[in-house]
């Protein structure tokens, strides 16, 4: 026979558990679930960085190493890619506001970005270097050769190229041009002497335009890696992004894309 005392204790315990359960917050869907429910992966891209992520104005389509990665990433989720335009100047604000799920367009991993946003493990090793006219290649052998008032250095606004120039070339004549993809052509035409860029981009533009040279390509000023940028706070999403990149590195996909777009 069950005693009244046992019934009371059991009832009290059940009521207590029910009360606790009622106070516990309902688990919210994370980014991973949101994307799969939506059916699209929102990808932020500046669309101005050959060979990483470049908007081909003739076809209206994005091209490059990071574009291929984004497409494969979306495929792993069973969704399609929708590109969201951003700029180097607004990249941080756009990422922090959740304008897109990831940003992947040749984004340098930096401490400043890591403090405000989540960033994937690094991929592809590169460094800051210069692009100049082939006729001027012998003039620029070191950073000191750039840091002169007579040298017109052109950069795009808001990114690490501008930050590098401001920090390391205080005596140069710094020119800021809004469209990164237009700067190599302006250098070739003599509108500026040097573009601060990265080894990946410099290699591509010297291949595409015989008027250009990258004399310091094998001895860059810095050593960096790219990363995928995300709004801070969703550890499950960050884990999935890192897992995907590790898998694609392990199975040779990243090496194949590097051979196709960079080497």
Segments predicted by a language model, with ranges:
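Extended ligand-binding regions for polar small-molecule ligands
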Residues: 68-76, 134-136, 144, 150, ...
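Acidic, polar ligand-binding/catalytic clefts
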Residues: 71, 75, 80-145, 213-214, ...
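Extracytoplasmic small-molecule ligand-binding "clamshell" domains
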Residues: 29-106
